[in-house]
Curated annotation (Swiss-Prot):
Its EC number is 3.4.21.92. InterPro entries: ClpP, ClpP/crotonase-like_dom_sf, ClpP/TepA, ClpP_His_AS, ClpP_Ser_AS. This is ATP-dependent Clp protease proteolytic subunit 1. One of its GO terms (biological process) is protein quality control for misfolded or incompletely synthesized proteins. The lineage of its organism: Bacteria, Bacillati, Actinomycetota, Actinomycetes, Streptosporangiales. GO terms for molecular function: ATP-dependent peptidase activity; ATPase binding; serine-type endopeptidase activity.
Length: 222
């Protein structure tokens, strides 16, 4: 069986360095008293209660399924209230990205997107894919867009041709989505993603990926 080092479905990873294995900070739990008694909580549970989904990992099938399940649940609870995605992600799988993106467009609630830290590669598409007028970034956020990455291929000539055609199809799909949400032409997007295009929060606003840069809430820092 032919083997490919490069998989366009899983190599849409962002950043200027390879993505390292993920490690998890141990989340604290706490007891919250309510009118119905006491319950054990953690920060993610509390965010979910406030209709906030935190995308703080690489985008793969597992994280995509979790994010989609949360969006569908929140739509079921209340289809008229916004859902907010906080994004701090280096990117990841293209098919996983598309699963989340399609769900964002499918559910009835508006989707607010907020970049904290970075939205690179696939994560930048999620950031741009939020509801127009409700896409934001914190002041020191880093946003990166680029073409789907390759690491070289080998195998039969017909297999290489199939994979080359597929990566071009994926690239065109990416360009079309970014053009739709930024208001720029497909041709301009195509030129810009030839190499890594790194944007500050203000540059991302000018480019059309976000609509506003959030000010700090501390009065002393305004």
């Amino acid at each position: 069986m032919s083997e490919f080092n490069f998989d366009p479905y899983r190599r849409y990873g962002g950043g200027m360095a390879p993505m390292a294995p993920q490690s998890r900070y141990v989340l604290p739990s706490y007891i919250e008293r309510t009118a119905y008694g006491v319950k054990e909580m953690n920060p993610y549970n509390k965010l979910f209660e406030e209709r906030i989904i935190f995308v703080g990992v690489q985008i793969d099938d597992t994280s995509a399924n979790d994010i989609i399940a949360q969006m569908m649940t929140l739509e079921h609870i209340d289809s008229d209230r916004d859902i907010t995605l906080y994004i701090n992600s280096p990117g990841g799988s293209f098919t996983s990205l598309m699963a989340i993106y399609d769900t964002m467009q499918f559910v009835r609630p508006d989707i607010q997107t907020v970049c904290v830290g970075q939205a690179a590669s696939a994560a930048a598409v999620l950031l741009a894919g939020g509801t127009k007028g409700k896409r934001t970034a914190l002041p020191n956020s880093r946003i990166l867009i680029h073409q789907p990455a390759t690491e070289g291929t080998h195998g039969q000539a017909s297999d290489v041709e199939i994979m080359a055609n597929e990566i071009m199809r994926i690239r065109h799909q990416l360009e079309t989505i970014l053009a739709k949400h930024t208001g720029r032409s497909v041709e301009e997007i195509s030129r810009d993603i030839e190499r890594d295009k790194i944007l500050t929060a203000e540059e991302a606003k000018e480019y059309g990926i976000v609509d506003d840069v959030l000010p700090y809430r501390k009065a002393s820092l305004k």
